[in-house]
């Protein structure tokens, strides 16, 4: 029912009284608000300070992440302030908690610069996270409207084109990170790359913190790595690649390194999340213009994504990175050494791979999301995985993933090439069993043992790592599940 002119006038006069009034009364709380298709939606987990009403805390989050300050300002009247105010429109208690609330907040699309992750995040995760009225605050999910998505280029290459370039279909990509990640000379580094690729991997990669240190400058690494790639291609007849980490102190230096990688014939470059949103978008634009695959290492994300009550959920980073234009992003393994609840990981992968997301509360997906034809991002599973887990990896993660066995390749007792061969044989045996309709999850260990009868490197790997697991309960688990999930 619409308000009368008198009622609207009364509210307006009350709202613009001088001084400090509650955010909820300033217009940042509207339980009757009708969400528009063009609104940017955000879901925050709000933990109010003791004595602070959850509705007021949610309204404060809406206000401080949009147009509000601590007191009424008359200059609001010079703007379309009723339109530009973010509106908290629903507040729900978080299941199984006594002091946490889900705040649903809508933002008008005109509050954000087109095609700018930096501007979007300056509002959504800006000053509001230091606001005293909340004890803790976490951004759990967002819905990005199609009208805003269309201002971003999306992944530079995308999964489908990458498969065509690599000529790899019907199975996950196989890769490995060079180990040790720091300290090798350029020549030894190149040898590791060659052995891994010749043994059967599709990719080798730099790790997040190998840039241009005194023990090996970047140009030396690039030259030896590409020599290794070319020799491995000649030896195997397969398309291969090495992720060249072009992360550097300045954009000018990153451009120089990326251009050199291109001149050497590399099909892929790599950057780290820590370079920042603007730099990531800038390199994604460069990658698309230069027909390069862009790999993103999520270095630094757990400083703000791992804890359940403060920071932001990694699924939000997945959405921002798909908008920014990366082709790969590390997104968890479930069974490896890094944080990863099975349901949460599935939600991350779906966010990166699906063209349309439905609400799925067990996976932590709170909003329907149409991806507006933005290309798919290939998830990367890396960190503490080995060939003995191949049936679990294929079951949890599916085909569209890069499985990276760093220590699980280079730590093989018979050498790097043997480690790579063990992983390739294990993967192909498991994919074949799946394609034949076998219950490859239940039969997985036996499938691997059978494959190892004709592959000595696989048998050695299974003997070495058969008992290695990382069974820790995840800190970030779903709020809407019947039973707890374990990292097994």
Curated annotation (Swiss-Prot):
Enzyme Commission number(s) of this protein: 4.1.1.39
One MF term in the entry's GO annotations: magnesium ion binding
Catalytic activity: 2 (2R)-3-phosphoglycerate + 2 H(+) = D-ribulose 1,5-bisphosphate + CO2 + H2O; D-ribulose 1,5-bisphosphate + O2 = 2-phosphoglycolate + (2R)-3-phosphoglycerate + 2 H(+)
Enzyme class: lyase
GO CC terms: chloroplast
Cofactor dependence: Mg(2+)
Binding site for substrate: 127, 177, 181, 298, 330, 382
One Pfam short name: RuBisCO_large
GO BP, sorted A to Z: reductive pentose-phosphate cycle
Cofactor note: Binds 1 Mg(2+) ion per subunit.
Site (Transition state stabilizer): 337
Keywords, sorted A to Z: Calvin cycle, Carbon dioxide fixation, Chloroplast, Lyase, Magnesium, Metal-binding, Monooxygenase, Oxidoreductase, Photorespiration, Photosynthesis, Plastid
Residues holding Mg(2+): 205, 207-208
Miscellaneous remark of the record: The basic functional RuBisCO is composed of a large chain homodimer in a 'head-to-tail' conformation. In form I RuBisCO this homodimer is arranged in a barrel-like tetramer with the small subunits forming a tetrameric 'cap' on each end of the 'barrel'.
Annotated PANTHER family: RIBULOSE BISPHOSPHATE CARBOXYLASE (PTHR42704), RIBULOSE BISPHOSPHATE CARBOXYLASE LARGE CHAIN (PTHR42704:SF17)
Name by which UniProt lists this protein: Ribulose bisphosphate carboxylase large chain
């Amino acid at each position: 029912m619409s308000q009368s002119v008198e009622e609207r006038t009364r509210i307006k006069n009350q709202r613009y009284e001088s001084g400090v009034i509650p955010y909820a009364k300033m217009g940042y709380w509207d339980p009757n608000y009708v969400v528009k298709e063009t609104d940017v939606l955000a879901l925050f987990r709000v933990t109010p300070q003791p004595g602070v009403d959850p509705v007021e805390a949610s309204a404060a989050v809406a206000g401080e992440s949009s147009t509000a300050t601590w007191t009424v300002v008359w200059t609001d009247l010079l703007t379309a302030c009723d339109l530009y105010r973010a509106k908290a429109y629903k507040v729900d208690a978080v299941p199984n908690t006594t002091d946490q609330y889900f705040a649903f907040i809508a933002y008008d699309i005109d509050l954000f610069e087109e095609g700018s992750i930096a501007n979007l995040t300056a509002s959504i995760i800006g000053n509001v996270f230091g606001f005293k009225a909340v004890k803790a605050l976490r951004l759990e999910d967002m819905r990005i409207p199609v009208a805003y998505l269309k201002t971003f280029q999306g992944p530079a290459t995308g999964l489908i084109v990458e498969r065509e370039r690599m000529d790899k279909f019907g199975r996950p990509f196989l890769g490995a990170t060079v180990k040790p990640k720091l300290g090798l000379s350029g020549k030894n580094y190149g040898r590791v790359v060659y052995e891994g690729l010749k043994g059967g991997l599709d990719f080798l990669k730099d790790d997040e913190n190998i840039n241009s240190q005194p023990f090996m400058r970047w140009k030396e690494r690039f030259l030896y790595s590409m020599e290794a790639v070319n020799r491995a291609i000649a030896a195997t007849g397969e398309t291969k690649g090495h992720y060249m980490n072009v992360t550097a102190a300045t954009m000018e230096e990153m451009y120089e390194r990326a251009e050199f990688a291109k001149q050497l014939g590399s099909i892929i470059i790599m950057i780290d999340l820590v370079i920042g949103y603007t730099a990531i978008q800038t390199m994604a634009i460069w990658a698309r213009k230069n027909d390069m695959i862009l790999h993103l290492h999520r270095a630094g994300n757990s400083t703000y994504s791992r804890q359940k009550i403060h920071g932001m959920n990694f699924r939000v980073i997945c959405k921002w990175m798909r908008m920014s234009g990366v082709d790969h992003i590390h997104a968890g393994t479930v069974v490896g050494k890094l944080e990863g609840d099975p349901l949460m990981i599935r939600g991350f992968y779906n966010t990166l791979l699906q063209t349309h997301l439905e609400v799925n509360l067990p996976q932590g997906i709170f909003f329907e999301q149409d991806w507006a034809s933005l290309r798919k991002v290939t998830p990367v599973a890396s960190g503490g995985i080995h060939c003995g887990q191949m049936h679990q990896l294929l079951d949890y993660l599916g085909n569209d993933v890069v499985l990276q066995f760093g220590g699980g390749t280079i730590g093989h007792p018979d050498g790097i090439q043997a480690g790579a061969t063990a992983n390739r044989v294990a993967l192909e045996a498991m994919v074949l069993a799946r394609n034949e309709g076998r219950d490859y999850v239940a039969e997985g260990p036996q499938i691997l043992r059978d494959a190892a009868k004709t592959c000595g490197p696989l048998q050695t790997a299974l003997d070495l790592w058969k008992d290695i697991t990382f069974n820790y309960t995840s800190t970030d688990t779903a709020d809407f599940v019947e039973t707890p999930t374990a990292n097994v």
